[in-house]
Amino acid sequence: MASGEDGPRSCMVCGDRATGYHFHALTCEGCKGFFRRTVSKNTGLTCPFAGNCKVNKAQRRHCPACRLQKCLDAGMKKEMILSAEALVQRRAKQAQRRAQWAPVQLSKGQQELVQTLLGAHARHVGTMFDQFVQFRPPAHLFIHHQRLPIPVPALPLLKHFAEVNTFMVQEVIKFTKDLPLFRSLPMEDQISLLKGAAVEICHIALNTTFCLQTRNFLCGPLCYALEDGVHVGFQEEFLELLFRFHATLRRLQLQEPEYVLMAAMALFSPDRPGVTRREEIDRLQEVTALTLQSYIKGQPPRPRDRFLYAKLLGLLAELRSIDNAYGYQIQHIQGLSAMMPLLQEICS
């Protein structure tokens, strides 16, 4: 399975690997630095070869004039470069914010909640991906195509997928049953919450195995690519949406407490069909949400923390839409529903 992106992007100036948009154009770090230095110095540059020099990764240093012109042609804007004075002021403000940062301490109750979630996660979810190899995977799933010794024949990909997904849902159910707050709810509400959140929690946990470089899921010795999902029978458009979600979430570089709190927020959703104690479940979700907010605020400032809580709320909403689409896909893949009645029940 691959992400929804098209792989590494190229610098619009020299063709090297781009690191992002700099001064309004997609460029590499080298061309970003060159443009800033050249514009800041404000020196007149002249090409000795009539302005026809080739600018690529190997030759970009040969003619500064042509390189600057190509920067401008690519859309880089001089007015976006801060003056030396403005740059000093910005760095001073950043340093001041770091100096003024005071960590938010979790309350005793919040600490206990985090520890309970982490403990249940470690017992039931943390190691489940390494166990996928027990479900007789096809040979091509092994990393580097090097098979491990398995005493029984491999399963077809569809059957392997069904068994792995059933196993994940079973472990997620054990995870939730290990949470006192969840067990305190009536059984009918536990069932309703699990039917709504089990697949979402699976994907939150699965995100820890997603590799941004390869756009694959690395589960122990196994590697799952987008093409595997296509072979199972999922629509490629759905898989691209799913992989784009995982890439976005993975880039946030969440810590384990943030992952488990995100999973708990998905679990304690008071708007799931069939729940009876909506106010109580709403209170549990609020407690979880406030704990997540406090945990994020308690970490040293990092660029990825900017609006992190709001980003996670948006991703939870997106995940719910993906879950609905996933249920539809499961119903329409021939023979799959019969192979995993537990997931069929959850998605119904």
Swiss-Prot record:
GO biological process entries: cell differentiation; negative regulation of transcription by RNA polymerase II; positive regulation of transcription by RNA polymerase II
GO molecular function terms attached to this record: nuclear receptor activity; RNA polymerase II cis-regulatory region sequence-specific DNA binding; zinc ion binding
Keyword terms, alphabetized: Activator, Cytoplasm, Cytoskeleton, DNA-binding, Metal-binding, Nucleus, Phosphoprotein, Receptor, Transcription, Transcription regulation, Zinc, Zinc-finger
Processing and modification events after translation: Phosphorylated at Thr-38 by PKC, dephosphorylation of Thr-38 is required for nuclear translocation and activation.
Domain NR LBD residues, every copy: 109-348
Localization terms from the record: Nucleus; Cytoplasm; Cytoplasm, Cytoskeleton
Positions carrying Phosphothreonine: T38
Pfam family, one: zf-C4
Zinc finger motifs (NR C4-type), residue ranges: 11-31, 47-71
DNA-binding span(s): 8-83
Gene3D superfamilies referenced in this protein's UniProt entry, alphabetically: Erythroid Transcription Factor GATA-1, subunit A (3.30.50.10), Retinoid X Receptor (1.10.565.10)
GO CC term, one of those recorded: nucleus
InterPro entries named among the record's database cross-references: NHR-like_dom_sf (IPR035500), Nucl_hrmn_rcpt_lig-bd (IPR000536), Nuclear_hormone_rcpt_NR1 (IPR050234), Nuclear_hrmn_rcpt (IPR001723), Znf_hrmn_rcpt (IPR001628), Znf_NHR/GATA (IPR013088)
PANTHER family: NUCLEAR HORMONE RECEPTOR (PTHR24082), NUCLEAR RECEPTOR SUBFAMILY 1 GROUP I MEMBER 3 (PTHR24082:SF231)
Subunit structure: Heterodimer of NR1I3 and RXR. Interacts with PSMC4. Interacts with ECT2. Directly interacts with DNAJC7; this complex may also include HSP90. Interacts with CRY1. Interacts with CRY2 in a ligand-dependent manner.
Domain notes: Composed by a short N-terminal domain followed by the DNA binding, hinge, and ligand binding/dimerization domains.
Function according to Swiss-Prot or TrEMBL: Binds and transactivates the retinoic acid response elements that control expression of the retinoic acid receptor beta 2 and alcohol dehydrogenase 3 genes. Transactivates both the phenobarbital responsive element module of the human CYP2B6 gene and the CYP3A4 xenobiotic response element.
Family per record: Belongs to the nuclear hormone receptor family. NR1 subfamily.
UniProt-recorded name of the protein: Nuclear receptor subfamily 1 group I member 3
Species of the source: Callorhinus ursinus (Northern fur seal)
Upper taxonomic lineage: Eukaryota, Metazoa, Chordata, Craniata, Vertebrata
